[in-house]
Amino acid sequence: MVNTLANELREGTTKSHSMAENVSFVKSFLGGVVDKKSYRKLVANLYFVYCAIEEELFSNKNHPAIKPIYFTELNRKASLSEDLNYYYGSDWLDFIEPSPATKIYVDRIHTIGHKQPELLVAHAYTRYLGDLSGGQILKKIARGAMNLSDSGGTKFYDFDQIKDDKLFKDQYRAALDMIPLSDVQIQNIVSEANISFTLNMKMFEELNSSSLKIITMLIANTIQKFKAKYKSTLAMVD
């Protein structure tokens, strides 16, 4: 296999990706247990993260390492703003602030944006490709777990300007391989991608619910699924 940036990032972050999926909050989320209070805190934290990423990408959009992967259709700030308006109301900015882990994450993005812009590639790759890859599944889980009846609250997962996720991801990976980088720079970007995963994990860990709360929600979730299955069975009998 050719040692391209896209391949190096995929292979070099496999362990970090697995670790991130095993953080308690993420495992609960994937299992269909989503606490609305924790979820809206996550949305708020992601708002600050994406504001930082998108500010630095814009500032460095003509940098040789950023220009090939600068796609404004990926921007999440506006969609996160819609979600925050849904959960907190029109004055949502008065109610949110970055958590301690989020502040560290945001500071990291601004620091490399000013000093080593090529490392922004790692953060863009980690967040945006992750959002595109699992977004629709996570959206379905979130809507079902929080019993969201209308279309609000999960705009973050909607990429309205991207018609074909798979085609776009292929385009993005091809763009990664167009970036003029030395072998050392490629390894630095892979290392930064692992740092990005760690920063995300720290942010998720702050959102962990208590064990009792998780167990209670799991039981409630199981009961709801059983009731739905029971009703479906009765309907078939009738």
UniProtKB/Swiss-Prot annotation:
Top EC class of this enzyme: oxidoreductase
This protein's UniProt keywords: Chloroplast, Heme, Iron, Metal-binding, Oxidoreductase, Photosynthesis, Plastid
Catalytic activity: heme b + 3 reduced [NADPH--hemoprotein reductase] + 3 O2 = biliverdin IXalpha + CO + Fe(2+) + 3 oxidized [NADPH--hemoprotein reductase] + 3 H2O + H(+)
Domain of life, source organism: Eukaryota
Subcellular location, record wording: Plastid, Chloroplast
Binding site for heme b: 17
UniProt keyword annotation of Transferase present: no
Record has Chloroplast as a keyword: yes
The EC number(s) this enzyme carries: 1.14.14.18
Family named by the database record: Belongs to the heme oxygenase family.
PANTHER family: HEME OXYGENASE
Physiological role: Catalyzes the opening of the heme ring with the release of iron. Key enzyme in the synthesis of the chromophoric part of the photosynthetic antennae.
Name assigned to this protein: Heme oxygenase
Protein source organism: Pyropia yezoensis
Gene that encodes the chain: pbsA
